[in-house]
Each structure stands twice: as C-alpha cells, then as structure tokens.
From Swiss-Prot:
One of its GO terms (molecular function) is RNA binding. The record marks 41, 65 as: Binds 40S ribosomal subunit. Belongs to the SUI1 family. Residues 1-21 are annotated as: Disordered. InterPro entries: SUI1 (IPR001950), SUI1_dom_sf (IPR036877), SUI1_euk (IPR005874). GO terms for cellular component: eukaryotic 43S preinitiation complex. This is Eukaryotic translation initiation factor 1. Its main location: cytoplasm. It comes from Gallus gallus. Keywords: Acetylation, Cytoplasm, Initiation factor, Phosphoprotein, Protein biosynthesis. The modification Phosphoserine is found at residue 2. The gene is EIF1. Component of the 43S pre-initiation complex (43S PIC), which binds to the mRNA cap-proximal region, scans mRNA 5'-untranslated region, and locates the initiation codon. Together with eIF1A (EIF1AX), EIF1 facilitates scanning and is essential for start codon recognition on the basis of AUG nucleotide context and location relative to the 5'-cap.
Length: 113
C-alpha cells in the first residue's frame, strides 16, 4: 500500500518567500501587464517581470513599431526595470509576447479595469 505524500499542513497566509516546496515550479516568473490611468482618458500600460536575459530597449523598440505608440524603460525601486507604453496595449502585448515565444499564455498576468 502506498503512502499519501500530500498530508503536510498548508498555511495560505504564510510568506511565499520562505522557500517551501509547496508551490509549483515557475510561479515566480510571471509577466505582469498593468494599466494605469493618467489625466483624462489617457492611460499607461506597464510590463514588469521580463527576464534580464532580454534587452528591454530592443523590446520597447519592437513594441513602438508594432503598436504605433510611444514607450520607454523606467527603473522602479521595487520591481526593477519596467516597460511603459502609452495607451491601452494589454491585449497587443499579450499576443505579441506569445507570438514571438517570449512567454506562454499561462505566464501572463493582466491587471486593470
């Protein structure tokens, strides 16, 4: 008779940074795509969590050319390098990142309205 392996207690409010092996692999490498309201109807789209292996300035250049918007890379004190784009580009960024193979669909987290 085989022993059941998952009989450990699980605390959902515990710190995720303790290094417990209860979380599945790959949960920390999400790419977060957020939208921020500016003045009036203007919005900013931010992309955070792209690996350091990729040149973010080249990605911004490709985004600007593909989506016909302005963009830049800013240094955020908490999140590191973050890509900022003008306008609501959430769907476009998701499709583009999956299309070029930089991220899978389940690695993208879209936040906003």
């Amino acid at each position: 008779m085989s022993a059941i392996q998952n009989l450990q207690p699980f605390d959902p409010f515990a710190d995720a940074s303790k290094g417990d092996d209860l979380l599945p692999a790959g949960t920390e490498d999400y790419i977060h795509i957020r939208i921020q309201q500016r003045n009036g109807r203007k919005t900013l789209t931010t992309v955070q969590g792209i690996a350091d292996d990729y040149d973010k300035k080249k990605l911004v250049k490709a985004f600007k050319k593909k989506f016909a918007c302005n963009g830049t890379v800013i240094e955020h004190p908490e999140y590191g390098e973050v890509i900022q784009l003008q306008g609501d580009q959430r769907k476009n960024i998701c499709q583009f990142l999956v299309e070029i193979g930089l991220a899978k669909d389940d690695q993208l987290k879209v936040h906003g309205f």
